[in-house]
Amino acid sequence: MQSRSQHFSLRAAFFFSGALSLSSGAIAAAVQTEPESEKLEIGDSQPGNYLSALIASADRDTPAAEVYYREALRVDPRNPDLLERAFAAALSNGDETSASSLGERLLGRDPNNNLARLAIAIRDIEQGQFASARAHLAGAEAMRGRDVTAALLTAWCYAGQSDLRHALDALDRIRDPSVFAFRDYHAGLIAALLGNVAEAQRRLKSAHDDDKNSLRFADAYARLLSAQGDSAGARKIYEDFSNIIPHHPLIQRALADLKTNQALDPVVHNAKEGAAEALYGVGSAGSRQGDELPALVYLRLSLYLRPSSDLTAVTLASLFEQLRQSDQAIAAYGLVPSSSPLKMGADIQIALELDGMGKTDEAMRRLTDIVAERPHDVEGLSALAELQRSAKKYVDAAASYDRAIAAVGIPQRDNWTLFYFRGICYERSKQWPKAEADFKKALELYPDQPLVLNYLGYSWVDQGLNLEEAFKMLRKAVDLRPSDGYIVDSLGWAHYKLGQYAEAAKTLEKAINLKPADPILNDHLGDAYWRVDRRIEAHFQWNHARDMSPDSEDLPVILKKIEVGLPDVTTQAPAPKASLQKEGGG
């Protein structure tokens, strides 16, 4: 049975969502942390700057949009549309100082602008002006509807004034059952901050009991128990969480600290950090639920209040990855403090983002430096091996996987990928006996793993080995992953390799329906059609494959087939490679 908190609706929390949507053109442009106005050419006319701002917004270039809107507004300061767009661009770009200033002007025109009230309230919280912040939150229309976000921030404002009774009262007015765990979590943090340990323990236990999958709920409750001298209770909470989500760096650090009897810091140390935690929670929910634009604003504001928050920085970076803004993802990962347990993972993600941007050499250098600094870190070694493998440096990648496997010690089920990918590297570097042994080891650790079944099964078919067992493996893989076009393709291509062309065509058609835009699969289906005398359809598929940016070594082969078709079976050239070039998974 799912916990109530797992149904937490982001829209229930976003009392500013209406205002956000009014300025979606500017907010959707969010890509960078700091405007780089020195690189921009400011126009001489207001219409020119306004047009540049619109173009920058369409290109998701918020720094430029903010600069151009500001310049356009400077020429036409009474334009309400420009004012709101400039405000939204500043807010989504993380420029809280400008946003709050523009927000003041917006409120002069529209006292019910909720987004402007939010920006000003957050500024007041940052400055310790909690009464003023509460006044702005109370002035928002949605506050009268018992909004979750407003209630959370109001409660933390009361906490900043050491008023526990009113803080808890603000939270307990929340009536949505889906948010009760979130409510109790913040009530517990406030009670702990203000010294009511019994109330803190009751509330945090309630939140944790409601959702044991929540990292924040588990961490906060365990830290409270540790502070009260219950190290065994804290350890059990962390260990139980590790059974659900293994190897989380924050949990591993906390367990290590408990083992050496080090004190665990509370989740928040003051009301400002508590408000940041509330914004982080709502923004994180938005990121998970695909409500990306409001989530971006909340995460930006959270970092404004607590710039050192590692979880917020990582969540913001992940959001930028969703938005395919690699530069901004890298900048956000760079905000993770060097002392954080998440720093290693953040540095690895920076390298992977660089690789995705085509900066593979720089990415490789970064990962090499990481591994040199921490030579026994499995995560770093695995990332380096993955990058080497994707660059087709199979011998180097296998050596990195060697080191990762050695660092693991006794392999467990979740280490199957190390053997699987090392096996691929061995297979690609013509070391089949080693590859076969690794694939078998991966299956020993994770029986019936479909990707491994697919790769080993096809490899056996390709070499004419263990054919009966190989086809059992391939069929099993398809049964387990019937919607994986690459795995279905492998079964079809195995039929083709054995001359079972009618069955191959039938199976490969299923693969194409699942993965229509892959050049290898289209090439395979074209070959199968040719063998069953469907020549026009064969050319159609080969032409598709040609137009889908195939690998450079495949393109000449495809062009040759388009020109002259396939040779007779008795004089056939070596068959094209199978789709396990994709490692069997989509």
Question: Each PLM stretch: what is its role?
Answer:
Residues 75, 108-110, 142-143, 174-177, ...:
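Structural marker of alpha-solenoid helical repeat scaffolds
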Residues 54, 88, 122, 156, ...:
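Residue-level recognition of tetratricopeptide repeat
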Residues 57, 91, 125, 159, ...:
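Position-specific recognition of the canonical hydrophobic site in helix A of tetratricopeptide repeat
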Residues 26-86, 91-101, 111, 255-258, ...:
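N-terminal leader/linker segments that initiate helical-solenoid repeat arrays
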Residues 85-86, 119, 153, 186, ...:
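Canonical tetratricopeptide repeat
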